[in-house]
Amino acid sequence: FFECTLECDIKKEGKPCKPKGCKCNDKDNKDHKKCSGGWRCKLKLCLKF
């Protein structure tokens, strides 16, 4: 499992990529679960959609 906690906790464009406690492991990535503010965590990276 690839945890992307660090990547998702950092801020981009002044907005947090993901809320605390929002996990983004390999299983979640397959589901392409959205994070707050339209951010998605994919391949251990925070992407804005």
From Swiss-Prot:
Cellular compartments annotated: Secreted
Paired cysteines (S-S): 4-17, 8-41, 22-24, 35-46
Tissues where this protein is expressed: Expressed by the venom gland.
Principal cellular location given in the protein's record: secreted
Stretch forming the signal peptide: none
Listed GO MF terms: toxin activity
GO CC field: extracellular region
Top-rank taxon, per record: Eukaryota
Keyword set, alphabetical order: Disulfide bond, Neurotoxin, Secreted, Toxin
PROSITE patterns: HWTX_2 (PS60022)
Family: Belongs to the neurotoxin 12 (Hwtx-2) family. 04 (lasiotoxin) subfamily.
Function description: Toxin that causes irreversible contractile paralysis into adult Aedes aegypti resulting in 100% mortality after 24 hours.
Listed name of the protein: U1-theraphotoxin-Lp1b
Organism of origin: Lasiodora parahybana (Brazilian salmon pink birdeater)
High-level lineage: Eukaryota, Metazoa, Ecdysozoa, Arthropoda, Chelicerata
